[in-house]
């Protein structure tokens, strides 16, 4: 009957307020690392900035959506050399070919008849964080190979500025040579967060860090989604 005596003693110990252990065992709480879940396709549209947010980021007014796409553009035949296509514009088909991406959303915006500001904002979904990271790493190797390029239809020439790679974001500015006053240039930014690539192209007389700023806002939104 010893098993019954032991069971009864244990039950009494649980019920009694004064029953304590005098052992020296320490209780440890396991540390868990929270890993963000991969984003899914239905979330992509909500990542893009509103026209009002774009106005603030680009320091202008009147920005409005002129085009929305879920397929990639292909401007590979209108610029040279081809290795500069990734810097010339965001979300290009030839750039993402064979990358394994799953889905994409993009919007183009400008400020109407004035057309002093332009934005193309794109978010590209990959099946895994690793695949998105591989695309970013390949881009980080490829971007510096471009120094200058030409739009073959218009004959306009562009010079690529210093390329920054910091905090999982590539960025640069490419001014158009011999542009009419007050000038024209385009900013580029490519950011990696979770299983999403944020791909931004901004153009104005002085794009400065507008592409990086917009990419950062969208990237922060990606990071906040658990």
Identify the residue ranges that each predicted region occupies.
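N-terminal export and membrane-targeting signals
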Residues: 1-11
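C-terminal motif of bacterial Sec signal peptides marking the signal peptidase cleavage site
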Residues: 15-18
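N-terminal "mature-domain start" segment
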Residues: 20-107
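Short Gly/Thr-rich strand-loop-strand
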Residues: 69, 140-185, 225
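A short acidic-to-branched-hydrophobic micro-motif
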Residues: 99-137
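Short, surface-exposed coil-to-beta transition loops
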Residues: 118-120, 182-188
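Short, well-ordered beta-strand elements
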Residues: 119-122, 191-204
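Surface-exposed amphipathic alpha-helical segments
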Residues: 201-226
């Amino acid at each position: 009957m010893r098993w019954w005596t032991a069971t009864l003693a244990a039950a009494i110990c649980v019920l009694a307020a004064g029953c304590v252990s005098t052992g020296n065992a320490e209780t440890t709480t396991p540390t868990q690392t929270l890993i963000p879940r991969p984003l899914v396709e239905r979330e992509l549209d909500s990542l893009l900035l509103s026209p009002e947010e774009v106005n603030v980021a680009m320091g202008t007014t009147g920005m409005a959506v002129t085009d929305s796409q879920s397929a990639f553009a292909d401007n590979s035949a209108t610029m040279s050399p081809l290795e500069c296509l990734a810097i010339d514009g965001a979300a290009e088909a030839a750039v993402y070919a064979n990358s394994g991406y799953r889905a994409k959303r993009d919007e183009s915006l400008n400020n109407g008849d004035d057309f002093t500001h332009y934005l193309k904002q794109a978010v590209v979904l990959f099946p895994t964080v690793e695949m998105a990271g591989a695309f970013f790493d390949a881009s980080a190797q490829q971007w510096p190979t471009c120094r200058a390029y030409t739009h073959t239809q218009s004959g306009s020439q562009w010079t690529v500025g210093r390329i920054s790679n910091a905090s999982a974001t590539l960025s640069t500015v490419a001014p158009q040579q011999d542009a009419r006053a007050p000038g024209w240039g385009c900013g580029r930014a490519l950011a990696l967060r979770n299983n999403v690539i944020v791909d931004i192209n901004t153009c104005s007389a002085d794009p400065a860090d507008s592409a990086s700023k917009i990419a950062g806002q969208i990237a922060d939104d990606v990071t906040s989604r658990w």
